[in-house]
Amino acid sequence: MTGSIAELIPAQERAIRLSPRDPQVGLFYFRIGFGHLLQSRTDAAIVWCEKARNATPAHPLFRTLLASAYALKGDSASAAAELAEARRLVGDDRYSSITRLRAVVSWGAPKDLVEATYFAGLRRAGVPETDAAAAGVGGGAGPTERQGAGNA
């Protein structure tokens, strides 16, 4: 994502208006939800992240953003369910720790906001800061390529 957070949401809303049946509409919803989460508007983030999940149910990153928002709202059961489904869908260990997730996802948003919202929510959802593989214990080489938010 590029540009300011203030520009993000209107740009995505415009894209949805121009192309409501776009095959990437789930990504537009995700970006709106992410923008709301970064601004600590958790209720709005949940609405848009649920739309993203419903539009693209097999996208694990959409589910982790929703898990984070649910956890920040205090809905630990929904957060745990979304996190478990994201882990099942992704097929690797990127959601095993905050450290591992940082290694594979590039957000293009201010790091302090991502820390205060997305990662804080994932911590509340039960994602540990590190794990044995992420810390280099047990021979895990770790991820080698970074993926953008649309591909994680």
Predicted feature residues:
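Alpha-helical protein-protein interaction modules
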Residues: 1-152
